[in-house]
Structures are given as structure tokens and as C-alpha cells.
Swiss-Prot record:
Positions with a binding annotation for a divalent metal cation 2: 105, 169, 202, 235
Catalyzed reaction equations: Release of N-terminal amino acids, preferentially methionine, from peptides and arylamides
The protein's name in its UniProt record: Methionine aminopeptidase
Claim: Metal-binding is one of the keywords in the record: yes
Superkingdom of source: Bacteria
One example of a Gene Ontology biological process annotation: proteolysis
PROSITE patterns (UniProt xref): MAP_1
InterPro entries per the UniProt record, alphabetical: Creatinase/aminopeptidase-like, Pept_M24, Pept_M24_MAP, Pept_M24A_MAP1
Species annotation: Mycoplasmoides gallisepticum (strain R(low / passage 15 / clone 2)) (Mycoplasma gallisepticum)
Binding site for a divalent metal cation 1: 94, 105, 235
Gene: map
Keywords attached to this entry: Aminopeptidase, Hydrolase, Metal-binding, Protease
Length: 250
């Protein structure tokens, strides 16, 4: 079901997004360097709790962590473990926040200062893809299929590929709502983007080919079959307005 939000609901969603923006500011490399993913997960949980909100991924479909922490070869859905985040690493932090029964869902990638330049470029391109899509959105004209086509075209400009079975979605009243927003075009389903929809746009890029598997050790972490490459994921919540789109998590 697609939820068209009213002004009060939009404000509640923005309130949740404010907590996310504070996390992005606080959780930089220097703040979490040389800590384990489990420690970072707990730090995030504490931060969210201090703002009278909940980390809503915990228990969702059986997820045992509180946030998705995707280190290096994990592109999405990383489950916190004892691995240490160092200066040579990429870490994507995907956060679901519930505040007063409204939700924010967004993800950002932190790069250590000694990360490979290829990983740095991939992260920049993945993040910039969202900005390019948001600029192109025309309410009551653009569709979710357009977003998928534009995402894959943008990735291919740099020789990258997109994940095929995961993507963005509606959000706000529930953590995951319709419509599904794939990272590629499909004729199977396409929804018009209309005012007062809130969606999550989340490009997930592979540096090379997009074959993947789910790590059997934790049954969550999505990783590339081809290990000789880098991967990256970014996500922003976007409000569709009357004449344009607005990023709520920036």
C-alpha cells in the first residue's frame, strides 16, 4: 500500500530524520575508528535511545542487530560482529529510526583515510546518483520505473553495475512501504510519484559485475561473488512536493 502523507505526518517523519542527521554528523571516522562493529552498533543504539527514539531494525524479520553495518565486501544488510573498522576500510551504516510511531530509513558510507581510491570514487558516484535522480524528479510525471532506469544508466556511465533484487521503497508510516524502487528499469510494475509521497532512494553499486550471495555465516550480509571489486550503498529519504523533490536526510 502506498501512503500519501498529510502535513502532520510529514513533520513527524522529518522529526525522525533529524535524529539521523545528527548521527551522520557525530559518527565520523575519528569517532568510530578502531572499534568493532558490535561496539559501533551499541553506540548507535545508545545515541538513538538518548533522543527518545528506537532502532527499529532489531527483530525485523529476525534481524539480530540494531543497524545494518556493511564493512568492505558487504554491500547491504551487514550484521554487526567483532570485525574492526580501520583506516583502510569502507563502512556503510544503514539506520532505521522510529520516533513517535513514525520512521526514518537512510544510509551513509564512511571511508577510512587510507581506503583505496577506487572505493572512494565508487562511494562518491553512488552518493551523487541520488542527487542526480532527485533533480530529475517531476511530480505527477516521474515514475518509479524512471528512477530505476536513471539509476542503472548513471552506474553504467562509470562502468559500474547495480544490484538486481534489492532497492528503495516508500517509508514514514511504516519502515518499509510501497512502492518498491528498483535500481533498474522494469515493465513489471511502475508507480507515479505524486505529492506527499515519501520514498527512500538507495543505489547499490558494484564496481564490476553484480552477481551476489547472502553470507551463510549470518544469513543477512549481501556480498559480491566476484571478490576482486569494491561495492557501495547510500540511501536518502525523499519527499515528493508539488513542484519538486526534497531530500529529508541531508
Amino acid at each position: 500500500m502506498i501512503y500519501i502523507k498529510n502535513p502532520n505526518e510529514i513533520q513527524k517523519i522529518k522529526n525522525a530524520a533529524q535524529i539521523y542527521k545528527k548521527i551522520v554528523k557525530q559518527f565520523n571516522f575519528d569517532y568510530i575508528k578502531n572499534k568493532s562493529l558490535k561496539e559501533i552498533d551499541q553506540m548507535l543504539r545508545d545515541f538513538v535511545s538518548q533522543h527518545h527514539a528506537n532502532s527499529c531494525y532489531h527483530g525485523y524479520l529476525g534481524f539480530k542487530g540494531y543497524h545494518c553495518l556493511s564493512l568492505n565486501q558487504t554491500i547491504i544488510h551487514g550484521l554487526a560482529n567483532d570485525e574492526i573498522f580501520t583506516s583502510k576500510d569502507k563502512l556503510t551504516i544503514d539506520i532505521g529510526i522510529e520516533l513517535d510511531n513514525y520512521y526514518c530509513d537512510s544510509a551513509f558510507t564512511i571511508l577510512g583515510p587510507d581506503v583505496n581510491p577506487r572505493q572512494k570514487l565508487l562511494s562518491e558516484v553512488t552518493h551523487n546518483c541520488i542527487f542526480e535522480l532527485v533533480k530529475k524528479i517531476v511530480p505527477n510525471q516521474t515514475t518509479t520505473n524512471d528512477l530505476g532506469i536513471w539509476t542503472e544508466e548513471y552506474a553504467k556511465k562509470y562502468g559500474y553495475s547495480v544490484i538486481k533484487d534489492f532497492g528503495g521503497h516508500g517509508c514514514g508510516i511504516k519502515i518499509h512501504e510501497d512502492p518498491i524502487i528498483l535500481n533498474y528499469g522494469t515493465k513489471k510494475s511502475s508507480e507515479l510519484l505524486t505529492p506527499n509521497m515519501v520514498i527512500c532512494i538507495e543505489p547499490m553499486f558494484f564496481e564490476k559485475d553484480n552477481r551476489y550471495y547472502i553470507d551463510p555465516d549470518d544469513s543477512w550480509s549481501v556480498k559480491p561473488v566476484n571478490k576482486n571489486q569494491y561495492v557501495c550503498h547510500w540511501e536518502h529519504m525523499v519527499l515528493i512536493k508539488e513542484d519538486q523533490a526534497e531530500i529529508l536526510t541531508l
